[in-house]
């Protein structure tokens, strides 16, 4: 792949070995001199002007997350008949013409029918969707307090992130990221807030992304 082009406002940090997203987030926050820190998984899309919309409402003791869609990242297009198959494992053959040649077509759009604003975790720190919460009166405004998040994306003042100790690298590189983030938000006296004024879309690599135990 070609190298990333230089930009005076972008600092690329290289590691010989993968260090995991907890450590990577900590390194980025430590190197930054910005007022805010925003963490986003690579397999995500964001709303235009998402940062400005979050800054307008962010309070010093808040951790904020955009409302979330599922991401329609790509389709598989049959090179023979042009039929397209929804993202996932590359089809072995086209169901329309039995052709075996396919090319990836980038879509990169949110799926409107897959929308979430609230999450929680159980007594085992296991992440859960909180579907019923979105119907409560307190969840009808543009800013909604939620118990947890999936951990793919968050926004807060950088000094608060550092004061909370960043992400706990002793807890592993990946698992329970959202549970740790949310627990630190409200156990420190702050809040975890979903903003409906903006959104992010996350690619969930489940379902037809898996075949014969591989994804």
Label the predicted regions.
Residues 37:
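Short aromatic/hydrophobic "clamp" motif used to bind/position activated sugar donors
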């Amino acid at each position: 792949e070609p190298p990333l082009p230089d930009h005076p406002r972008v600092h690329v940090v290289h590691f010989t070995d993968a260090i995991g997203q907890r450590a990577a987030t900590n390194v980025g926050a430590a190197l930054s001199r910005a007022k805010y820190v925003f963490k986003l998984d690579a397999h995500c899309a964001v709303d235009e002007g998402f940062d400005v919309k979050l800054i307008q409402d962010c309070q010093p003791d808040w951790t904020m997350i955009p409302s979330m869609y599922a991401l329609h990242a790509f389709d598989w297009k049959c090179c023979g008949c042009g039929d397209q198959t929804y993202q996932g494992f590359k089809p072995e053959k086209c169901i329309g013409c039995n052709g075996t040649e396919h090319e990836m077509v980038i879509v990169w759009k949110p799926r409107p029918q897959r929308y979430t604003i609230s999450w929680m975790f159980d007594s085992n720190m296991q992440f859960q969707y909180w579907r019923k919460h979105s119907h409560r009166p307190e969840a009808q405004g543009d800013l909604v307090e939620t118990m947890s998040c999936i951990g793919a994306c968050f926004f807060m003042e950088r000094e608060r992130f550092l004061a909370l100790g960043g992400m706990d690298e002793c807890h592993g590189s990946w698992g329970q990221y959202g549970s740790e983030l949310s627990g630190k938000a409200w156990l420190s006296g702050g809040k975890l807030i979903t903003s409906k004024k903006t959104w992010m879309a996350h690619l969930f690599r489940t379902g037809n992304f898996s075949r014969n135990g591989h994804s």
